[in-house]
């Protein structure tokens, strides 16, 4: 029902999958499907919220869901995923008005390209944390990483990014 699109539904699905595959591994990949209710306006609202979050507007409360896998993922899943190497350094915490502010720097390398981030997590009223992440340069990363919290060790991890049923996952 979109007059601007001329491809068949099958071609549109193939194009959507190709676009998703090209973005796999990006640190801020968000897949925004069609909502069950609310129509196009609801989709635009979700897009705007995602863009504001990426631009640094803090989310009310950080919510992450993690699961422990009982066995390694199937090889075919890893073969179609985008591997991302992460190096993360926790910095000395700072005292904020509502408690300690957790800080870290992180590098993400995908296909030979590295991007750097500085993240703060502040206590939120009623529990939870408000996270703010900003992109930084390599030199800033190096300088901040030198302020590592001596009670922590740097973390190296490999994530495998993929889209399943319209949702982005990092394994």
Name each model feature, range by range:
Residues 1-24, 34, 38:
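A glycine- and Lys/Arg-enriched "phosphate-lid" helix/loop adjacent to the NTP-binding pocket
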Residues 4, 24-28, 125, 143:
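Generic alpha-helix detector with strongest preference for long hydrophobic helices that associate
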Residues 16-28, 95-101:
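Short C-terminal domain-edge/linker segments immediately following a structured domain
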Residues 26-46:
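Phosphate-binding beta-loop-alpha motif at adenosine-nucleotide cofactor sites
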């Amino acid at each position: 029902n979109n007059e601007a699109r001329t491809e068949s539904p099958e071609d549109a699905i193939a194009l959507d999958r190709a676009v998703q595959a090209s973005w796999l591994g990006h640190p801020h990949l968000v897949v925004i499907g069609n909502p069950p209710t609310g129509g196009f306006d609801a989709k635009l609202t979700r897009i705007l919220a995602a863009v504001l979050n990426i631009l640094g507007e803090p989310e009310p409360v950080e919510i992450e869901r993690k699961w422990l896998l009982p066995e390694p993922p199937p090889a075919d899943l890893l073969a179609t995923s985008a591997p991302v190497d992460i190096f993360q350094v926790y910095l000395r915490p700072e005292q904020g008005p509502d408690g300690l502010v957790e800080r870290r720097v992180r590098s993400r390398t995908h296909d030979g390209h590295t991007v750097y981030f500085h993240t703060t997590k502040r206590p939120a009223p009623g529990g939870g944390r408000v996270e703010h992440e900003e992109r930084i340069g390599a030199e800033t990363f190096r300088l901040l990483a030198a302020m590592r919290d001596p009670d922590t060790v740097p973390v190296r991890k490999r994530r495998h990014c993929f889209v399943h049923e319209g949702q982005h996952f990092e394994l």
